[in-house]
């Protein structure tokens, strides 16, 4: 059976997903698209899915009889309503981050899915599908380095545009660490603090950059995450886990080591999409396979809620300078499997 998918949102990410669904992945095809900009929808159809029907309203796309599953890649504030509508129609839905723009919105989705009785939602956190992070988790879970005590992490971008704001360091950037570190350790956070080093001259006047986020988990693991979105030299993701008996480090992407003209060098990526391109393929294939098996296993609506609660606390900490509590509701048994 080929899974028939409708895509809501045909911007850069949406078109990239349409491309991989039609040209790279197996077991699915795009039969419907929608975008607030009709030209974007037409472009997606022209370039990647010539047989797909264009819908003027995303709700009509969700209700369409030939749409068996939905991808939501539209503007963030629209996600909650589309996901809730997909659940109401009993259709599996893959939603790019954020699941909703507030923790309360994420909880409404959780409650709707609980009421439905089966998992329908997968959130687009792709780092758990990265082979480097998977290898790191295997080491942690094996007990080889003992219990994790500390994590030292960094999320560095070459540069960001003028529209990037201080709180986006949390909601657009750190949100990936908030999800993947929770997954690595298998536990929730209890507090967050944000401190500001000396500001780089490369940051716009309204942006605090870099920032350091300090997190504590339920068991007492301490995490520091450097966010530096105008580092100039490239796109660089680091994660070092300090355990009782050793240290495990996220591997850098493979690159050719060059010795030339009395210098030794290794190229560093500059594009975040290039760094995790394989992970996007794996996560979406996992969604397709999960829908066909009627068993979704990827990041859940609860994971989206947990990341949103932690992000809200980090934004509060940006403003207060204090250690802010992270109060996550008790996880339902539905999401513990």
Swiss-Prot record:
Give its E.C. classification number: 1.1.1.18
Would the keyword Lipid biosynthesis be found if you checked this record's keyword annotation? no
Catalysed reaction equations from the record:
myo-inositol + NAD(+) = scyllo-inosose + NADH + H(+)
Q: What InterPro entries does the record point to?
A: Gfo-Idh-MocA_inositol_DH, Gfo/Idh/MocA-like_OxRdtase_C, Gfo/Idh/MocA-like_OxRdtase_N, MI/DCI_dehydrogenase, NAD(P)-bd_dom_sf
Q: Name one GO biological process term.
A: inositol catabolic process
> Would I find Oxidoreductase among this entry's keywords?
yes
Q: Give the record's keywords alphabetically.
A: NAD, Oxidoreductase
Q: How does it assemble?
A: Homotetramer.
**What role is this protein assigned?**
Involved in the oxidation of myo-inositol (MI) to 2-keto-myo-inositol (2KMI or 2-inosose).
| The protein's name in its UniProt record | Inositol 2-dehydrogenase
